[in-house]
Amino acid sequence: MTGAPPYHPQSPTQQSHYAGYSPSNKPRHYYPNSEHYQQQPPQTPPAFPQPNLARSPHYSHAPSPLPGALPPLNGGAPTPAHPSDPSPQYQAHSAAGTPQYPLPRPYSGSLLPASGTSPYGPSTPSHAHPSSRPDSHAHVSPKKEPESHFAVNHGAPAYSVMREPQASPPKEAKPARAADPMSFASILSGPTEEQAPPKIQSPTPGLGTIHSAVPAANATSLNPPPASFHPKVGDIEPVPPVSAPRLEKKPSADKRQRNTEKEDLKSAENPTNGVTEPPKILRPPRRIMSEKETEMVNKYMVEIDNAEKSDVEAPGFEQERERYILKGKKRALDVERAESIRRKRRRHDYLLKLGKSFEKQANAGMDRFRYANEASVISEVQAKEIQDEKERKKDMQRKRRRENTVRMEMQKKLEAELKANETQDSAEKAKFLREAERAQRKIKTTKRALEGVTEPEEIGEITPLAPNLEGGITSSFHIGRSSPSRRKTGRGGPVTRPKKSKEQKQAEKDAAEAAYAAMENDEPLPLAPREDPRKESLKKDAKGGRSKEATPVPVSTYESKGYNQIYEQIWRDIARKDIPKVYRTKVNSLSTRQENLRKTAQLASKQSRKWQERTNKSMKDTQARAKRTMREMMSFWKRNEREERDLRRLAEKQELESAKRAEAEREANRQKRKLNFLISQTELYSHFIGRKIPGAGGESGDAGVQGTEAMDLTPGAGAKVTNFEDLDFDAEDDTALRQAAMANAQSAVQKAQERARAFDDPNKSTMDTMDDSELNFQNPTSLGDIEISQPTMLTAKLKEYQLKGLNWLVNLYEQGINGILADEMGLGKTIQSISVMAYLAEVHNIWGPFLVIAPASTLHNWQQEITKFVPNIKVLPYWGNAKDRKILRKFWDRKHITYTKESEFHVLVTSYQLVVLDAQYFQKVKWQYMILDEAQAIKSSQSSRWKSLLGFHCRNRLLLTGTPIQNNMQELWALLHFIMPTLFDSHDEFSEWFSKDIESHAQSNTKLNEDQLRRLHMILKPFMLRRVKKHVQQELGDKVEKDVFCDLTYRQRALYTNLRNRVSIMDLIEKAAVGDETDSTTLMNLVMQFRKVCNHPDLFERAETKSPFSLAHFAETASFNIKQSIEDDGAFSFLRFVDTSVGEAFNYSHQGVFERALRRRGQTNRLSRLSVVYDEDESSTATLPHTLFNIVDRNDRQAVYDIAVEGHMRELMNVSRSVFEQEGLNVIEPCAGPAASAPPITLVSSGQEALIETQDALFNVPVQHALFGTPSKAMEEQIIEQQLDPTPYSLPPMLPEPISTKGRYTHIEVPSMRRFVTDSGKLAKLDELLRELKAGGHRVLLYFQMTRMIDLMEEYLTYRNYKYCRLDGSTKLEDRRDTVADFQQRPDIFVFLLSTRAGGLGINLTAADTVIFYDSDWNPTIDSQAMDRAHRLGQTRQVTVYRLITRSTIEERIRKRALQKEEVQRVVISGGAAGGVDFNTRNRDSKTKDIAMWLADDEQAELIEQKEREALERGETFGASKGGKKNAQKRKRDVTLDDMYHEGEGNFDDASAKPSGAATPVSTAENIGTPSASTPVPKRGRGRGGKGTAKRAKTTKERLRLIDGDGGLGSG
């Protein structure tokens, strides 16, 4: 691995320990091509070079500024050490002109340690014991590369035990001294040369000492050693013999001789190149003494020689000397053993690195080959596919032509056979049969060609080369010519070979046999005489000549008719056939001759101009060659420069990648330590609070924090709070970080306590009465025995788990800690919150102010429950318009007010929207307790709602939520951040840990880290209390969930398939990877369209009313007022005789026949005697027996079948109609209707009478009422006002009943409700389900995602006569309470239609025992909240939940994703096992790609996953853009899944009365796949916020609509 670790485990002042390693210096000619960067074989080099090695300029290093820890063993001056730069790529070859990118070098400086100490550990004096460590890699990060030894060991001499393991015996290693060691001659003379090592590697050891004198002198002059290390004359002691080979190592002689001048210059510049020689060797040359000085020296020497001898060499130290020698040998063996281990490790590391290098190069070669040949292979495959397609098309055309040929030839054959059968002439019949046979052969060959069978060639003797039927080897093949045609020559054509007679063939055969026999007998062959054939030929010529001569023939007068016909036929054949052939032949011959002449002329002209070309050819060739050479040279240099540039860029790219990789590793380690610090700090805080609050563990009652109990939680005396940004995660160790986390946690808890005490009244605060020891976090059990009873002012009886929750909330309040009450929905979070307020008022006399913020649909519920359960607490409902709220603020808009029992209000209840609107007023009040109901509304820490609520002055905050995790773990982290903003800061690392390691696990199909889950639960326990129904509420009924799968109907399947075929899933995924807003919006809209089709096709395309086409014009309104006047002039005196008044006569004269018949209707006639026959006694019009002889009115004459009351005779006269009605044919919908209808005939007249009569007939209102039996509106009002019996005024219609009750009198077809139900698979299944539930006495909550679907459901429920009520986002706040109350109190309401978002929060609907989700939400917690409206406290029956899912559609994939989210919530909150969870979800950055995958079917999904794997193997990102401006577009606000599934439904938790907007506009078949009307469409034109689009021409359809006056064209 490359790169250095981000930190060192030891202190900065401590010396680093690295492995000592020095390769042998091979001569430069050893390397291939005399290049010192060539890769070396993986062999183990010699252990150590000479300690005074003078490096070549190619291997020079910068001097180190740090001195060694200890001086050298030989007393020399300490040399500077090399700086410990963690980046190995900047250490090696800094002074040489080497390339600036790393090359593979096995023994270069980048592989060796960079410390300033000895390679064996810390520097020790020569008499100390060696280090006890077996190797020096114990404290080095395994990710750090070994660094160069040459950059390290400049001053400290290295042991040479590994090079020369056999130490010389002590007697041989003893230095040779003078006879008297204390004499001046021995002192002033030069030091005796130490024993040279064995001459194994250096044949000329003397050169090293001679050569190294100059650089050592320079080193002394440039860097003088400290004064404490200057040797004195009296301090010189004999050097131990064992240390001699360890101090010095002679360099190679041949290398010294080759680089003498370079080394001198380099040593002058860099005194630390190599190992500094001891001072006794590096002294300047002696000065020549004068005679006087010499005499003085000799004098003193004589005095010293004559002085008394000392006992330095006296015996008695043999044991110490032996012990010293044994220690030296032991130390040498230890060093040898340690070096052997290091050598093996270096060899292993080097082999691993070499293997990785080979693998990298192999992969790079594979990539280069793929990059170079991929395009050509793709183009070749594409070309082959195109060619194959062309061949296929040709084959199809050829096949069709052959089939047509077979069909035509078969027709010809049949015609020929028919003609042959019909004709009587034998010649004609033979001709037709030949044609039939020819057609049959052609059919046969064509069929063989169709079947792919070729006709085998017949073997014959007429081929150019006869077949070899007798075996043997054929020496040649006839390739030049094709096989001769088997066609016969035409009639009259030349015969290629004359036919022989049988006699000639027999004669030739006999001659051949005779010749063969003669050859076998070696006899001369009998040759036929030449004269005989010649004579025979002459005779034949003579006969022919005589026959051709014009012999005079006597004229015969006889002429035969057949002769003349034959003669004329011959001439006709010649004129018709032969002459055109000869003509064509002559014309072809002439054209060929002319073409040859033209070519000859051209060749001749070229030949004649050759002498001109020959003169200028040399000059032109020279210029051409020069230009060609120049072009080739330019192309060569360009190619060479391009290759060099590419190689340089590649090297730079590799260097940058390696640097980035190293930096990424360092940053990863740093982030890991930072995350560990954050988690440790949080769990320590949670641990302190958990031990303070006994009920923090919920109902589980476990041991809490097990791992933390065992730790020493006592912070040090000097522990102080450290800011997160000030921590150095690279240098600090785990212990220091642990102490810092503990101090920060302690400080956070103490600040929370102090803030709570500062908020309370000092005179009434309970915190002041506590002992100071209670704030000591080492004794947090003082509050463990506090038990709180139920407040007396609370009228309800709390359950056991609710009382436990009250204890937990009170302890949180007294500690000043905020919390999350996350009990499952329906367990009474509201009553627990109310009980806390009652406890504070009763025990601590804290009457407020309390602030309750809830969704708009639950505001009335909060007000009612507080008033019901705690009547002493006054509630102020804060909602309404701005004027109303201003009046309400007069009650609490005071800065300094003390709330008592007599205050005007104690609790203020409002909604989230109003809190944000009036945030400036809420911030002025100091609230004792702020309770947020349905706290998932503040799940985003970036929203203005979250920031506004966080700025309120509150002593404590309490969050109520039944679903703390809805979509991801970041929402839970936002809630924790809200309750403790100082501790749970919004660190990106912590948020990333929550999302990456738990929500969407990075590794495929792996279990969650149990330690991380344990730590997460430990963090959550003190701040969150959660209980589920099945654990704490036994009397609550069970909840059963059932998934009901429905199939797509024919209409749905057609729409679904058509919609999916019109979009390309691959294109959508590729565009989604780019992240363009337009493509994302299109994808969201597509998902919405698919959901519409699954719910009901009428959402996508509503069924239309059909009617025949008619060209008539129908008037909309018509009213006619005709003034009638009656003239009483006495002209109607005759009317008295006809029992008619003047008015009646006037009416009769102005009314038509139908009106007069209508007036007569209902009046009895005088002739009514026949009515007595069939009268019944019970009838009101019956004639009594004693009145039969009275004179009464008679009935009109009627037919017999009309008189009978029972109507049996009428049925006999209308048998067909009766059967039609009894069979039910009259209620069947008509299966067909006329395509067009004729308008009524229009009369055209010059006068007004015809017009008046027509209008009077068409628009006569009384006539219409009489025909259809519908009284006028005024009459109905009078009947109701006067309270009259409507029977006399509601006469039966005079128009007979239509035959079809569905079709009625017209052919207008209204969409059938029965078909409306059966068009949707979900609605058909729901129809069956509701019928069963209605029969069983159940009541239903029906949830929808789209309010448009609720509109359609209202039509269905009206059709089925089910009583229902409705609540969605458009329902006003004041209507919601009444609607819920109606459903709860009226059992006759069967169905409650609700929107999932509007009707799923905070309302109590326990009157229903059945919940049906028509379409599920992608967020499972929303559905859980909705179903818990019925499954909550107060529900005594079992709750059944039905979820309608359309099979094999997008809904199945959405449901699968929702189940994964449910599993995340179960694992994190409930603490369940994570074995069955598939956390292998996609990357969070590619959510749009996941949505696009929902649209694909199984085959497409498998294909997409395969392409993703292939792209991953190539190192690319599937669907990523290749470049372009599209990636640079600025992204606008993202369209989320929430917006997609609930488009236009409005804000359900707002108090606005705006319509939901979810009534999705009806789409037609022409705009499938286009954005719906709910998606904002950019305006057209410039300067209006949209792109300027060109004005397109109108289509023919649009022009016709414009001419017809149909209105808008759709585009506005």
From Swiss-Prot:
Main location: nucleus
Compositionally biased residues, Basic and acidic residues: 132-148, 246-267, 501-512, 529-549, 610-624, 1534-1545, 1595-1604
Biological process (GO), any one: CENP-A containing chromatin assembly
Localization per record: Nucleus
Extent of Basic residues compositional bias: 1523-1533, 1579-1594
Residue ranges annotated for the Helicase ATP-binding domain, each copy included: 810-982
Residue ranges that the Swiss-Prot or TrEMBL entry lists as coiled coil: 379-455, 612-684
Helicase C-terminal domain location: 1325-1485
GO cellular component, one term: chromosome, centromeric region
UniProt-listed InterPro entries: DBINO (IPR020838), DEXQc_INO80 (IPR031047), Helicase_ATP-bd (IPR014001), Helicase_C-like (IPR001650), INO80/SWR1_helicase (IPR050520), P-loop_NTPase (IPR027417), SNF2-like_sf (IPR038718), SNF2/RAD54-like_C (IPR049730)
Group of enzyme by EC: hydrolase
Keyword line: Activator, ATP-binding, Coiled coil, DNA damage, DNA repair, DNA-binding, Hydrolase, Nucleotide-binding, Nucleus, Transcription, Transcription regulation
Residue span, DBINO domain: 570-695
Record motif DEAQ box, residues: 933-936
Reaction(s) catalysed by this chain's protein: ATP + H2O = ADP + phosphate + H(+)
Binding-site list for ATP: 823-830
Cited function: ATPase component of the INO80 complex which remodels chromatin by shifting nucleosomes and is involved in DNA repair.
PANTHER family documented for this protein: CHROMATIN-REMODELING ATPASE INO80, HELICASE SRCAP-RELATED
Family: Belongs to the SNF2/RAD54 helicase family.
Quaternary structure annotation from Swiss-Prot or TrEMBL: Component of the INO80 chromatin-remodeling complex.
Protein name, as recorded: Chromatin-remodeling ATPase INO80
Species in which this protein is naturally found: Emericella nidulans (strain FGSC A4 / ATCC 38163 / CBS 112.46 / NRRL 194 / M139)
